């Protein structure tokens, strides 16, 4: 081995070492017992070095030289490399910034030998990739005072040294660099004129960069290679071939040992880069956008990540040991089969090199195991305390749930035993008197929601008056008087049922919902306070419709708007628009399942011009936050558009869903333009009891042409209320503030309107307005659910048809989403697998867009939206609300007619 190695500066045999990228051990020649540096600087054209005064020594006793020798080093070497200095110091207890070469040298005083301690200049300091793992040959980290626990498997005549990185022949001690980092000089092929030129290469973070010299690192990088997509192999004894598809790089190291250092470092860096790429998430749960976890959880996650990295290091070392062990075994087999004495020298050299490499790698594996064990022992007690705390919290939570269940049952029994039971709905409504005051329920906890009574402008009492008492009701500006006894009254509820002109037969049922039991609390308990759209949920809690289809389902009672087109009075038209806005909540009373979060770029069309007289298009225009744009055109003379962003929070006992964004409705003939927003939905009994949903909050509908207004109030349900559940009340007033109609009903059943004939202040001292009205007229009534609806997710007749397969739709349509289709067919396990695939595909697409934005391919607005541009909608300034909103820019229905969908992305 020593005979075949390049000559060292001292003129002796250069000891060879080959191993992991972190390990640059100076191995003495086995024949002459002189220590050789790990790299020959003359290979790069450096000047000749002085010959160190190293004396030959006698063969030591046959024992492993793994003991720490703490005697002082007495004699310095005569000369050292330029840029370094030679000192003579006693051996410290822990390895510092110098590299030492020491051993048991027979014949020297006290068993010590004069060696050269070389201090590298800062610009020559290079990281040793496996220093943190292979730190005991024997080396300890500067911040650690642990004594190495393993023996170095060195042969007789080998000296034990600290780990450093050879740079032009200089051994430099590093401080715990990462496993996938390395740098040094390599020869790079340039062209046939200049041939191989010396370049400075730096490996880190999965990237290999090179410079002409170290001084260029601060300002000029010649090229950067991404190792995750790079293939590399060895050419000859010192050559390295790198190929990333676009270019091929031919490199040469100074020796086989240095070449092996680089190959091993490249293998580690590539493996880590691929692991990082696979573990990154953006998901319907993007990891890089997740809310910050509590401090304890953050520390635990960091510890687990560190242990995982250590385990990956062990796995990599194990693979390398197996690889080098197999190569060593093959060499030994070849050695046994040799018969010609002339071949023995070359084969013995190969066997010696591989045996040395195997010993070094084995040592690295042992020390990596030691580091992993030490880290695990350090955190074991902390984990035990955390486990005990979690167990105590679980017991406390179970006790709390038991108390809540008892209170729940007690309240239900008390409510059922109340004399007379809950009051039934009537034609007389007293607003604000049924609300529970805080003083009467001071025992409620801090999570209880309190709703104040409406302001005086909307707090009222209605008194029904017979029609014959109405002589000549007053009419405000811009309004007309309606004859309530007329058979053709536009607000006559009997004429509100849509005509059945459907020419296409639609499906009336879907496969029954499978009876899979899954505890919602088991998933949600760790998500308190988080955004609901960022919580990864299995399809078990979904319904086989996307959010785009749920948004389209609001058009089920479109005939209310068709009827409103014919209204000559703007306040009468406002009544129908208000009833339409309330009707969109009627499908939610039993629909506690969560719709699918649409993929970014997903669309849904509803082309029902023949039977419903409208065309509807939805597109998911943003993923975080989830936002959908919607546009509807009706042949009856109205258009509706909106951009809805869903904000949702899990509060422990309930889930709040807050749709953000304005809804626009315009009638082309009259020019009336209505704008309103949605109310807040709340899902109760997340912890215990049956899930139920409620609507709460105020809605103001404004006609921006006439300035008419409608104030709607969704009354939250309360055990202590004597009013009907799910109640909605409202008042329609003109631009002068004069009230014309009173609205009443429930959002899950029906809405009525009563014309006001007289108003006066209340005589009971509460300062509430008393409205004297005519008998109520029916505005809207909910359609009955289809037969067997309880087994079909409580879908309405329209909802059953929304996911029905149709020809000619865009390839991004929700009907073509595979996980949603599998769930509808009852194959939930396959649907969960497919859902994970789609989410990972979406995360990959987002990373690519971010890379393009980083490269400067888009404007500022495009960068803020991670580079995605909607296909059928575009951002515009809404002149009425002053907000930026996505509005339909056209082109979809023309593309459908041409059957040209080449511009659609592949999202499924």
Swiss-Prot record:
Modified residues (Phosphoserine): 284
Chain intervals for the UniProt region annotation (Disordered): 42-112, 279-299, 413-445, 822-843
PH domain ranges (all copies): 179-271
InterPro entries per UniProt: OSBP_sf, Oxysterol-bd, Oxysterol-bd_CS, PH-like_dom_sf, PH_domain
Any one GO molecular function term: cholesterol binding
GO cellular component annotations of the record: acrosomal vesicle; apical dendrite; membrane
Compositional bias of kind Polar residues: 81-90
Principal subcellular localization: membrane
Subcellular location: Membrane; Cytoplasmic vesicle, Secretory vesicle, Acrosome
Recorded superkingdom: Eukaryota
SUPFAM superfamilies assigned: Oxysterol-binding protein-like (SSF144000), PH domain-like (SSF50729)
Topology of this chain in the membrane: Peripheral membrane protein
GO biological process: lipid transport; spermatid development
Alphabetized UniProt keyword annotations: Cytoplasmic vesicle, Differentiation, Lipid transport, Lipid-binding, Membrane, Phosphoprotein, Spermatogenesis, Transport
Gene3D superfamilies, sorted: 2.40.160.120, Pleckstrin-homology domain (PH domain)/Phosphotyrosine-binding domain (PTB)
Biased composition (Low complexity): 424-437
Tissues with expression: Expressed in the testis (at protein level). Expressed in postmeiotic germ cells of the testis.
Family classification: Belongs to the OSBP family.
Subunit-level organization: Interacts with CCDC159.
Function: Binds 7-ketocholesterol. Acts during spermatid development where its function is required prior to the removal of cytoplasm from the sperm head.
Protein name: Oxysterol-binding protein 2
Source species of the chain: Mus musculus
């Amino acid at each position: 081995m020593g005979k075949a190695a390049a000559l060292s500066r001292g003129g002796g045999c250069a000891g060879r070492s080959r191993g992991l990228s972190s390990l640059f051990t100076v191995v003495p020649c086995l024949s002459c017992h002189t220590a050789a540096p790990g790299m020959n600087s003359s290979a790069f054209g450096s000047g000749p070095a002085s010959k160190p005064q190293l004396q030959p020594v006698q063969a030591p006793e046959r024992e492993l030289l793994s003991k720490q020798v703490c005697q002082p080093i007495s004699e310095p070497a005569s000369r050292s490399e330029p840029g370094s200095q030679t000192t003579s110091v006693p051996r410290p207890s822990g390895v510092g910034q110098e590299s030492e070469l020491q051993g048991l040298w027979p014949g020297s005083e006290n068993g010590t030998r004069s060696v050269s301690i070389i201090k590298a200049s800062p610009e020559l300091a290079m990281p040793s990739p496996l220093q943190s793992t292979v730190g005991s040959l024997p080396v300890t980290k500067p911040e650690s005072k642990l004594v190495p626990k393993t023996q170095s498997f060195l042969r007789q005549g080998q000296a034990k040294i600290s780990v450093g990185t050879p740079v032009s022949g200089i051994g430099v001690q590093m401080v715990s660099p990462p496993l996938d980092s390395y740098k040094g000089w390599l020869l790079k092929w340039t062209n046939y004129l200049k041939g191989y030129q010396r370049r400075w290469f730096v490996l880190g973070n999965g990237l290999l960069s090179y410079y002409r010299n170290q001084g260029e690192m601060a300002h000029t990088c010649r090229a950067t290679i991404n190792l995750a997509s790079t293939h590399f192999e060895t050419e000859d004894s010192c050559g390295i071939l790198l190929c990333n598809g676009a270019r091929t790089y031919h490199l040469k190291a100074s020796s086989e040992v240095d070449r092996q250092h680089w190959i091993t470092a490249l293998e580690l860096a590539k493996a880590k880069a691929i692991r990082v790429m696979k573990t990154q998430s953006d998901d319907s749960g993007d990891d890089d956008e997740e809310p910050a976890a509590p401090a304890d959880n953050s520390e635990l996650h960091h510890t687990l990540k560190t242990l995982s990295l250590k385990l990956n290091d062990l796995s990599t070392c194990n693979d390398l040991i197996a690889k080098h062990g197999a190569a060593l075994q093959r060499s030994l087999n070849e050695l046994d089969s040799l018969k010609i004495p002339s071949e023995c020298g070359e084969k013995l050299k190969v066997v010696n090199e591989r045996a040395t490499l195997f010993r070094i790698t084995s040592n690295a594996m042992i020390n990596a195991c030691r580091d992993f064990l030490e880290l695990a022992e350090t955190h074991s007690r902390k984990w035990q305390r955390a486990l005990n705390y979690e167990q105590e919290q679980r017991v406390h939570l179970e006790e709390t749930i038991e108390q809540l269940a008892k209170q729940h049952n007690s309240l239900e029994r008390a409510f059922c035993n109340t004399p007379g039971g809950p009051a039934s709905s009537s034609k007389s409504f007293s607003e604000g008197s049924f609300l529970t005051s805080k003083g009467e329920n001071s025992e409620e906890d801090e999570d209880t929601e309190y709703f104040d009574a409406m302001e005086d402008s909307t707090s009222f009492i209605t008194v029904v008056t017979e029609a014959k008492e109405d002589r000549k009701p007053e009419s405000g500006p811009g309004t007309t008087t309606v004859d309530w006894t007329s058979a053709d009254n536009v607000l006559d509820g009997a004429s509100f049922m849509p005509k059945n002109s459907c020419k296409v037969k639609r499906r009336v049922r879907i496969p029954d919902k499978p009876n899979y039991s899954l505890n919602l609390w088991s998933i949600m308990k760790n998500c308190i306070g988080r955004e609901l759209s960022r919580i990864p949920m299995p399809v078990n809690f979904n319904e086989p419709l996307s959010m785009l289809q749920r948004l389209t389902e609001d058009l089920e009672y479109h005939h209310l708007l068709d009827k409103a087109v014919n209204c000559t009075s703007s306040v009468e038209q406002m009544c129908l628009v208000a009833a339409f806005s309330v009707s969109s909540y009627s499908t939610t009373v039993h629909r506690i399942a969560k719709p699918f979060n649409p993929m970014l770029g997903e669309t849904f069309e509803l082309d029902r011009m023949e039977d419903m007289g409208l065309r509807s298009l939805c597109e998911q225009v943003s993923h975080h936050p989830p936002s959908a744009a919607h546009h509807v055109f009706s042949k009856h003379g109205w258009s509706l558009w909106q951009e809805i962003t869903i904000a949702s929070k899990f509060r422990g006992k309930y889930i709040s869903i807050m749709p953000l964004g304005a809804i626009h409705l315009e009638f082309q003939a009259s020019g009336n333009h209505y704008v309103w927003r949605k109310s807040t939905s709340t899902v109760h009994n997340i912890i215990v009891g049956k899930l139920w949903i409620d609507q709460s909050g105020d809605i103001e509908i404004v006609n921006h042409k006439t300035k008419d207004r409608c104030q709607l109030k969704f009354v939250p349900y309360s055990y202590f209320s004597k009013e009907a559940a799910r109640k909605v009340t409202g008042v329609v007033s003109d631009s002068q503030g004069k009230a014309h109609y009173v609205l009443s009903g429930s959002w899950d059943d029906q809405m009525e309107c009563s014309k006001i004939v007289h108003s006066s202040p209340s005589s009971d001292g509460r300062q509430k307005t008393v409205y004297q009205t005519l008998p109520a007229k029916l505005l809207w009534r909910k359609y009955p659910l289809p037969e067997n609806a309880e087994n079909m997710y409580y879908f309405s007749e329209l909802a059953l048809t929304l996911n029905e397969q149709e020809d000619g739709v865009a390839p991004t349509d929700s009907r073509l989403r595979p996980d949603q289709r599998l769930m509808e067919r009852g194959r939930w396990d396959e649907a969960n697998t497919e859902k994970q695939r789609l989410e990972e595909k979406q995360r990959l697409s987002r990373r690519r867009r971010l890379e393009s934005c980083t490269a400067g391919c888009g404007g500022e607005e495009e960068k803020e939206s991670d580079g995605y541009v909607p296909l059928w909608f575009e951002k515009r300034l809404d002149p009425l609300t002053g907000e930026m909103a996505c509005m339909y820019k056209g082109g979809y229905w023309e593309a459908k007619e041409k059957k040209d969908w080449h511009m659609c992305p592949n999202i499924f």
